[in-house]
A protein has these predicted regions:
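Active-site neighborhood of HAD-like aspartate-dependent phosphohydrolases
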Residues: 1-45
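Asp-based, Mg2+/Mn2+-dependent phosphohydrolase catalytic module
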Residues: 1-4, 107, 111, 118, ...
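An amphipathic alpha-helix signature
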Residues: 21-29, 65, 69, 127
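Short, surface-exposed acidic
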Residues: 33-48, 77-88, 142, 169
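A metal-dependent, Asp-based hydrolase signature
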Residues: 47-94
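Long amphipathic N-terminal alpha/beta scaffold segment
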Residues: 87-107
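Conserved phosphate-coupling serine/threonine residues in phosphotransfer and NTP-handling enzymes
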Residues: 123-125
Length: 228
């Protein structure tokens, strides 16, 4: 088989990510419930706050923490309590120190793929935070290179292609996000393998779009062995 270049996303592709954020959100919504707002409204306030913070501060737990604290203050108003703010900080600290839960079939599939192809881990987020997750996952040895970026735009994809001299027809992006993995990869001319995750972050969802590259959809990461 021809040796390909596989760009592999991390969060919700190699290990669980969003499920831990959702668990923290459930605790947060319970915290603000006494203020009488509908949960949908509280989530709307949080989503808007988070959107603004992502634009200013990027992705990651620290940006998420800022959004939770600011949303709490907006919802609590004059009823805000220092103990509640400390509880939010405690939630975030617990989230930050939660070790990656590697998804079923990932280690053996990476071992198989890395014996046949060039492997690049390609993930977005806060640099130190993502690097720590990669190290704690124990998966770094399967990759020839690790790329951590603040966002996954078409420009960033093209820069990665140029940096690693990827022949587009022989390059594949493997990921769980249509918005940040699959669509921009296809639009830059790469091929893409979509591995959907049941609990992908809502901001990651989008309609799959066509592009110059091929699109493959597999039901699990383990299923990649049937195609590569």
């Amino acid at each position: 088989m021809r040796r390909l270049t596989l760009l592999v996303n991390a969060d919700d592709t190699l290990w669980e990510s969003n499920v831990f954020f959702e668990h923290t959100l459930e605790r947060f919504f319970s915290l603000v419930e006494p203020f009488g707002y509908a949960r949908a409204y509280a989530r709307h306030i949080l989503n808007e706050t988070e959107r603004q913070n992502i634009q200013q501060h990027g992705y990651g737990v620290r940006s998420f923490a800022r959004s939770l604290e600011q949303s709490y203050m907006k919802l609590a108003g004059g009823l805000a309590q220092r103990s509640a703010i400390e509880e939010v900080a405690s939630m975030v600290a617990e989230l930050e120190h939660t070790p990656p839960r590697v998804l079923d079939g990932v280690p053996e599939t990476l071992a198989y793929l890395s014996s046949r192809h060039r492997m690049i881990l390609f993930t977005k987020g806060e640099q130190a935070e993502e690097a720590a997750k990669v190290e704690r996952s124990g998966l770094q040895g399967f990759f020839d290179s690790i790329e951590i970026v603040s966002d996954k735009s078409i420009r960033v994809y093209q820069g990665l292609i140029d940096k690693h001299h990827v022949v587009k027809t022989q390059g594949w992006l493997i990921g769980s996000s249509a918005q940040y993995d699959i669509n921009p990869a296809l639009q830059t001319g790469l091929n893409a393998a979509f591995v959907p995750h049941a609990l992908t972050w809502s901001k990651e969802n989008a309609e799959l779009q066509s592009g110059a590259g091929k699109l493959l959809i597999v039901s699990s990461f383990r299923g990649l062995r049937d195609h590569f």
